[in-house]
Amino acid sequence: MEKIIIYGGTGYIGKFMVRASLSFSHPTFIYARPLTPDSTPSSVQLREEFRSMGVTIIEGEMEEHEKMVSVLRQVDVVISALSVPMYPSQLLIIDAIKAAGNIKRFLPSEFGSEEDRIKPLPPFESVLEKKRIIRRAIEAAELPYTYVSANCFGAYFVNYLLHPSPHPNRDDDIVIYGTGETKFVLNYEEDIAKYTIKVACDPRCCNRIVIYRPPKNIISQNELISLWEAKSGLSFKKVHMPDEQLVRLSQELPQPQNIPVSILHSIFVKGDLMSYEMRKDDIEASNLYPELEFTSIDGLLDLFISGRAPPPTLAEFE
């Protein structure tokens, strides 16, 4: 059973990765910054919870090269779930992997758009370029890799688009970006994590791009809103934000506030997630493991109705 270390294992998607790794009985490690007096109680509690579940937490800085090399020599697979501001520090992970010499697979922090095949508005493009730099560095170092394009984090975007609550009791406005007809892919974070742990240890996925595009999870904003209205019993006022307004906001808002609107434009107006055909050497994740299945969008919304969905959060861009 492969030993897996997760960088960013206490972050939003990283927490799901850690739990998924444990669920498949992998010896699981986290490399994390040391706690400080300013650390939140929830951060302390999460580390205590993970330790009680058997996770080995190594505290250290990204610049501690020798420490990272020593830790990496104890594991087989490296998964980075670092947030956008930490993307460049993955070059330090690559250096440590090269020095360790034993890592069977590296999965960089991706899990969103397939960056080599789209060109969004400049603020989001600058984020994707940071990811491309990491990809090219991995390839130049000839490290065994898997690139995961997981598309939209399902609970994150349901929270963002529909702002639901466990027991909705009031009507609210819902913003529709563009016409609302553009198709995108919505995958529950728990499933993204489970498939990621599986592909990280699957020889078929070595040096390949794995795309999480289950046909049943391709949907438009209008379809998602209709499904939520039927399920919640509520009727929402729809407010359209046209293409031109998103473009203008991406130009006028300061950094990093211009990044989220550029992402919204990419996904919900341009349709970048569905803008390319799968190549013959791509792997579509939902075909890989008969014992696993992606949660349907209907099932995802049920989590919100029952109050079992992850709470709202916002991505960090600086």
UniProtKB/Swiss-Prot annotation:
Keywords for this protein: NADP, Nucleotide-binding, Oxidoreductase, Phenylpropanoid metabolism
UniProt-annotated catalytic positions: K131 (proton donor/acceptor)
Record site: Confers substrate specificity: V84, Y87
NADP is among the record's keywords: yes
Presence of keyword NADP: yes
Gene3D superfamilies in alphabetical order: NAD(P)-binding Rossmann-like Domain (3.40.50.720), UDP-galactose 4-epimerase, domain 1 (3.90.25.10)
Catalytic activity annotation: (E)-isoeugenol + acetate + NADP(+) = (E)-coniferyl acetate + NADPH
GO BP term, example: phenylpropanoid biosynthetic process
Site, Required for activity: residue positions: I263
Name the UniProt record assigns to this protein: Isoeugenol synthase 1
Tissue note: Mostly expressed in petals, and, to a lower extent, in sepals, stamens and pistils.
Molecular function terms from GO: nucleotide binding; oxidoreductase activity
Documented EC number(s): 1.1.1.319
Ligand binding (substrate): P260
Organism: Clarkia breweri (Fairy fans)
Outcome recorded upon mutating P88S: Confers eugenol synthase activity. High eugenol synthase activity
Residues where NADP(+) binds: 10-13, 32-43, 84-86, 109-111, 131, 151-153
Pathway in which this enzyme or protein is active: Aromatic compound metabolism; phenylpropanoid biosynthesis
Pfam families (UniProt xref): NmrA
Functional description taken from the UniProt entry: Catalyzes the synthesis of the phenylpropene isoeugenol from coniferyl acetate. Phenylpropenes are the primary constituents of various essential plant oils. They are produced as antimicrobial and antianimal compounds, or as floral attractants of pollinators. Isoeugenol is a characteristic aromatic constituent of spices and a floral volatile compound.
PANTHER family reported in the protein's UniProt record: PHENYLCOUMARAN BENZYLIC ETHER REDUCTASE-LIKE PROTEIN, PINORESINOL REDUCTASE-RELATED
